[in-house]
Design a protein with these regions (language model features):
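Short helix-loop-beta junction
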Residues: 37-43, 243-253, 470-476
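Conserved thiamine diphosphate
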Residues: 104-153, 159, 191-197, 402-404, ...
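Short acidic, glycine/serine/threonine-rich loops at helix termini
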Residues: 34-37, 58-60, 81-85, 107-114, ...
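Flexible, low-complexity linker and terminal segments
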Residues: 1-8, 130-340, 345-346, 357-358, ...
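A glycine-rich helix N-cap at a beta->alpha junction
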Residues: 43-49, 91-102, 182-188, 428-441, ...
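Thiamine diphosphate
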Residues: 1-133, 161, 225, 287, 371-508, 518-520, ...
Length: 576
């Protein structure tokens, strides 16, 4: 049977068909749907882990136990999982282990545009890269086989376009493998120096064998055109752009195995043409490899640069000098920047922080939008968990000057991911810092995934729920309080009180995400135009349900969830 599938959905199907038994991931766009889709198969155990490091260690443990395993994450998640990744490159596997890392070329939903191929190279872990949904499924299945053949975890690199675009996929039956035997082998899995030295020798020998495999594998294929004016070496989503933009005007070497890269295959292909262009998104890894192996008739980054995606129009203009028209919407869609939803519980908190003129150390989540107009409340956003650690450093640097006017904001899921250790640091090192945990009862930004505080697991079954108040107290924070961000006066008073204290404190701003299905909304509010004076104070909240018409505020009843923040804000009582 054939089916139209997203790349991530096809990836999940590949996990299922390959006989994968254990899946542990942390949600992160554009990788999230892989784990959500594979969780629908009863034959696969799937979970959300607290962070990517835990997910990778769980998958490695399952592999050592004899089960094919998988962990998935976005590109910045691989930074978090780098510690086990680099050592897993030494230990190798028992049963096959596959890692998905989804890069976000163009930074559609990310804080940086790093190229995950660097991690594969540095960790000496092989990496494959599909270009469409069919390849997603087939590459995953092959990755498990190669993982067991070469005794290595295999990374499959995804991109936003491949993950979230669709193509036809042939459905096949699941391969039931059973558990491989487990035998105690400390020289393989106990990475103390005496054993690790021997494994490093193994890794280098394995890399040589992988390079030999890269020379002949069908993953790397040459597509010769008799009308070719030049050659192109490409990979991933860029391959699709190349084929559409250049057609038969170029011969193409498509690299589906991007670490390690072949040598002779590239040399032989490049020798056929006076000029070869390397078209790869982000860093010039393939281009640099070409030059390292003596292929000097290549150009790449000097033409295409290091930033963002490489759409068909760019490739056609740069290489053919043509401004070609490609299938697209006739009219430009008006820009609609992301905003907090109507009724978002974070809005009231950020309004209070802005009103008080507080310096805010931000984090990763929906609440990052607190940095946008009209709230403009957040001063810094670095990475998961950095809000708390950064606050501690900020206050240690500036002392009393900042201690009573600076806070950290972090979501419940992000706090469980990597915020806890920062709070331990605050307690342990006697930091006079105020942390605000934005508890909206879900992992919101990536699409409502469960987390260790929600009381449910990935499949929706009951699970232990971490009590944030008790956890913060156990860490050593004596001042812990809960506020409702819909109540502006209460929230503002709590912030003032905790900032005035001479010890560390935690405010848990608790209100479920307004988009959760079980959340009951209040009747929508409306504006009494006779009372409205057009002061625009309600507009300062940045609620999408509120706009101005003929000098008066208007509330869209189809969007309003009745949170009441605007009513509390209105000084003339015009909102009823």
């Amino acid at each position: 049977m054939k089916k139209l599938m997203l790349g991530n959905e096809a990836f999940a199907r590949g996990l299922y068909e390959a006989g994968c038994k254990v899946v542990s991931s942390y949600p992160g766009t554009p990788s999230t749907e892989i784990t959500e889709e594979v969780a629908k198969y009863d034959e696969v155990y799937a979970e959300w882990a607290p962070n990517e490091k835990v997910a990778m260690e769980t998958a490695l443990g399952a592999s050592i136990a004899g089960a094919r395993s998988f962990c998935g994450m976005k590109h910045v998640g691989l930074n978090v999982a780098a510690d086990p990744l680099y050592t897993a490159g030494y230990t190798g596997v028992n049963a096959g282990m596959v890692i998905a890392v989804a890069d976000d070329q163009g930074m559609h939903s990310s804080q940086n545009e790093q190229d995950s191929r660097h991690h594969a190279i540095a960790s000496k872990v092989p990496m494959l890269e599909p270009s469409d949904s069919t390849e997603c499924k087939e590459f995953v299945k092959l990755a498990f086989e190669l993982s067991e053949k070469f005794d290595a975890p295999f990374i499959v690199r995804m991109s936003t376009r491949v993950a979230h675009s669709q193509s036809i996929v042939e459905m096949e039956d699941r391969q039931e493998l059973g558990l491989k035997p487990y035998e105690k082998t400390p020289q393989k899995f106990v990475m103390m120096p005496a054993y690790a030295k021997g494994r490093h020798v193994f890794v280098e020998e394995r890399t040589k064998k992988l390079i030999e495999y890269a020379e002949t594998t069908p993953l790397n294929r040459v597509e010769i055109s008799d009308k070719a004016e030049f050659g192109v070496i490409t990979n991933g989503a860029a391959y699709q752009y190349v084929k559409e933009a250049l057609g038969d005007k170029a011969s193409v070497l498509k690299l589906g195995m991007v670490n390690p890269l072949p040598e002779k295959l590239i040399q032989d292909f490049a020798a056929k043409y006076e000029q070869v262009y390397v078209i790869e998104e982000l860093d010039g890894i393939i281009e640099e490899h070409c030059r390292n192996i003596g292929v000097n008739n290549v150009k790449g980054k000097e033409i295409f640069g290091y930033i963002g995606e490489l759409p068909q129009s760019v490739i056609a203009e740069k290489l053919l000098g043509e401004k070609k028209e490609f299938a697209a919407l006739e009219d430009n869609i008006p820009v609609r920047p992301p905003v907090m939803c109507p009724g978002c519980p974070h809005r009231g908190l950020f309004y209070c922080l802005k009103k008080l003129g507080v310096t805010v150390s931000g984090d990763i989540g929906c609440y990052t939008l607190g940095a946008a107009a009209p709230l403009n409340a957040i001063d810094t956003t670095i990475c998961m968990g950095a809000s708390i650690s950064g606050l501690h450093g900020f206050n240690k640097a500036r002392g009393a000057e900042s201690e009573h006017n600076t806070v950290a904001v972090i979501g419940d899921s992000t706090f469980m991911h990597s915020g806890m250790t920062g709070l331990v640091n605050i307690a342990y090192n006697n930091s006079n810092s105020t942390v605000i945990i934005l508890d909206n009862s879900i992992t919101g930004m990536t699409g409502h995934q469960q987390n260790p505080t929600t009381g449910k697991n990935l499949k929706g079954d009951p699970a232990a729920a971490v009590n944030l108040e008790e956890l913060c107290k156990a860490i050593g924070i004596k001042r812990v309080r809960v506020t409702d961000p819909y109540k502006l006066a209460e929230t503002e008073a709590a912030i003032k009180e905790e900032l005035a204290a001479d010890e560390a404190s935690v405010i848990i701003s608790r209100r479920p995400c307004a988009l959760l299905k079980y959340v009951k909304h209040n009747p929508p509010f409306k504006v009494n135009t006779e009372k409205c004076v057009g002061c625009k104070m309600c507009m300062k909240l940045g609620c999408p349900a509120i706009s101005m018409r003929d000098g008066k505020a208007v509330i869209d009843h189809t969007q309003c969830v009745g949170c009441g923040i605007c009513k509390e804000q209105c000084k003339v009582g015009a909102i009823e």
